[in-house]
Amino acid sequence: MVFLSHIWLIPLLPALGAATMLFFGRKLQKTTINVVCVGAVILAFLFACGAVWQYTDYSRANPGKPYQNIVYTWLGTGSGETGVSPVQSGGETQPQIIFLTRDGRPAPLQADAGFLLDPLSSIWLLFVTGVGALIHIYSTGYMAHEHGYYRFFGYLNLFMFSMLTLILANNYVLMFVGWEGVGLCSYLLIGFYFHRPSASTAANKAFIVNRIGDAGFLLGMFTIAWYFGSLRFSEVTHLARSGHFAIGDPIITAATLLL
């Protein structure tokens, strides 16, 4: 299952396009910009189709189980007393943060660069990469005579990377990273014509509203970590279904509303 095992390439492709525009965009011809940025998103869409196709086979063999691919762990796992200690992961020493949950359980805080594919994320993956590819293709003509052509496509590629990270993240921390990236790109794209006062004002308004959403997201994330002792979607879902937590608990309701 080459597509599933390399699902991390889907967000990486537009990220590479954005990085290329950042460092070399000024020197590139429009044709080259189109090949790099539009090509990256089209490849991401084709790769997404392959990944979803292979996921259908995976789901038949593992009904109800999402596919997860953990690329790197920057906060390790383990058990022990509350505090900070190192843990070995992949031959490297990773920081390990252990805290007490609401019911007094010691819980290691886990944060991965990991990706998850399930029926819901599969639908959104195809939608975002497919529509994103069409937007990129349309923009090659719509923005053809605009100053800052490379900058616009750099923003679009960065937006695709952030949105795909948000969709495929297997934990709340990485999802928050994607959310922040989407907010940043919204600000950059809305304010693309920064010399126009109306565009600058609209971009600032969007930035402020997103920061309000960030506060709620963070509070909801911290509440889930404190209540369940985990930030991975699969573990939180398993604990929620275990029967040890009351569905009508005001804390769960509050965390849901904050998110």
Roles of regions detected by a PLM:
Residues 1-259:
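...captures the hydrophobic TM-helix bundle architecture rather than a specific catalytic motif
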